[in-house]
Amino acid sequence: MTGMSKFNKEITVFIFFLALVILWGLFANASADMKTPVDTKVPVDTKTPFQGKKVAGFFIEFEEGTTEPEVKDILENYNMTVNTIDYNSDIIPGRYYMILDRDRIMDIEELVDEVNLTIPIKKGSNYLVTVTEQAIEDKNFLAILEKNNLPVKKSVYCYIRLEDESENGSIPQKDAYQIANELEKNEKVLAASPDTRINHLLIEFEDGTTEQEVKSILEKYNTTMNTIEYDSNLQPERYYLVVDADKRMDVRNELGKDENWTDPIYHDIKKGNHYIITVTEQAIEDKNFLAMLEKNDLQVKNSVLCCITLGNESKNWIWESDERRIENELKMNEKVLTLLRCGST
């Protein structure tokens, strides 16, 4: 009996150990599921296989003063068959920037705040700092730059259209990104990116814009589209103020009294003679914030987000170069606040 009891005890221990292993396995699988959530919101391109995708051209940003002959000379060193060069293209406006060495970067550290200057990006042995359009319009900020002998330059953007008989692209997308990386190693090139396929366009319209108004605006600018998802939930709601240009800094100073009233990730948006200033959901529940609104005769508004599927019946994409032209026109509409393109996945 003693031997049998010992045997039964060993079986019991083994079964208990086996149960622990099974439970551990189930827990590990559950943990893996929790760590890798499935995003069901982001639209994807199901019509075009990734491996077969190609690009139509390149967007290349050159340093200030780069001439068209210099652009042609630079491109001859890379493996691409160029159809046309749109020099100083209006598809993408040139940006204001500064090229600084490491020592000078330390001098402007306190000026980098995402409103006037963006975080420096390493470019060779120096650093590239973008100067925002808001800063360019701020005389006081420009005076600070001049005082510190910090010259501002403006880049030259070029669009390079490649030869494409099929209209589905010329260079494979993978090869195009390698070419772009090589281009950026050139001292005269600030940035380079392929002209890829764009599937969706997220557009924020001003508070109260109806679905019919959205359709009319898009048709006015000949937007090539398949569907419109009106009042989409793909992004968090944006609460904002519309402030006269001459009162913007006063309101900004008021908002600066509480760090929870604004989010530094959102830049002010210039629309005509006004600025769109984004405020947080937390702010609109704050009595002091509401008192500030009443004092300045301001109202909180809520934008309307729409997701536009681009393309036609045969494809659900257009080239980024075509999308950017549409985007540039839409930006001029008084009811459009922001636009965000979404590429193929």
Curated annotation (Swiss-Prot):
Lineage: Archaea, Methanobacteriati, Methanobacteriota, Stenosarchaea group, Methanomicrobia
Protein's recorded name: UPF0228 protein MA_2656
Family statement: Belongs to the UPF0228 family.
Species name: Methanosarcina acetivorans (strain ATCC 35395 / DSM 2834 / JCM 12185 / C2A)
InterPro entries assigned: UPF0228 (IPR008887)
